[in-house]
């Protein structure tokens, strides 16, 4: 079962539908609905931290849930990505440019399991005003995708199956998004 922690965002249900279409059952909980121990008791096979409004520290148990990536594969999308970076000590700040419903060209590190089988570059959908400051990326995390001007668009933990993407793989404006989510599910 894939557990989707919903940060009160309409994109959560796009993720729910796309991941569900890829096979595994998906359970959705709100970010203030359960404790970390209650989540552990569900024995999820993987966890997705959804997009959402605001800052990671204001998103219920989302930042605390990052620790579960030491036990099962974990993917953070947009706010979920920011929560991963912040949980390890990175700084979330205003993005260089507000990106709401815009596509950007991104360069992928194809050694990252999420980007297996993808071209070296691709278009992704962006809906965010906050981003991780590149000079504060914690040493535990490795940048695995960047915009052409160097803004971090994805990270991977160096030891655990923890991944974050600033962009929206569930959007039709991310043509390879379904492949990325399939790669995560197969992790």
Language model: regions and residue ranges:
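Catalytic beta-strand/loop cores that center a nucleophilic Ser/Cys/Thr
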Residues: 112-159
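Extreme N-terminal starter segment of soluble prokaryotic enzymes
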Residues: 1-3
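A short beta-strand-loop structural module common to alpha/beta enzyme folds
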Residues: 24-34
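Histidine-centered divalent metal-coordination motifs
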Residues: 78, 128, 168
């Amino acid at each position: 079962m894939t557990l989707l922690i919903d940060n009160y965002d309409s994109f959560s249900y796009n993720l729910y539908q796309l991941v569900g279409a890829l096979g595994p059952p998906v359970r959705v909980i709100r970010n203030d609905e359960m404790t970390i121990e209650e989540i552990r008791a569900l024995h999820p096979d993987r966890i997705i931290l959804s997009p959402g409004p605001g800052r990671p520290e204001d998103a219920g148990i989302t930042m605390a849930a990052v620790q579960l990536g030491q036990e099962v594969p974990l993917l953070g999308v947009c706010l979920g990505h920011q929560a991963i970076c912040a949980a390890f000590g990175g700084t979330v700040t205003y993005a260089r440019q507000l990106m709401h419903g815009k596509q950007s060209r991104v360069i992928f590190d194809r050694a990252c399991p999420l980007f297996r089988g993808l071209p070296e570059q691709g278009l992704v959908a962006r809906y965010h005003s906050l981003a991780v400051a590149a000079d504060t990326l914690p040493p535990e995390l490795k940048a695995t995708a960047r915009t052409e001007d160097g803004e971090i668009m994805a990270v991977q933990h160096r030891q655990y199956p923890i991944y974050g993407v600033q962009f929206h793989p569930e959007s039709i404006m991310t043509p390879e998004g379904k492949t990325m989510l399939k790669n995560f599910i197969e992790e």
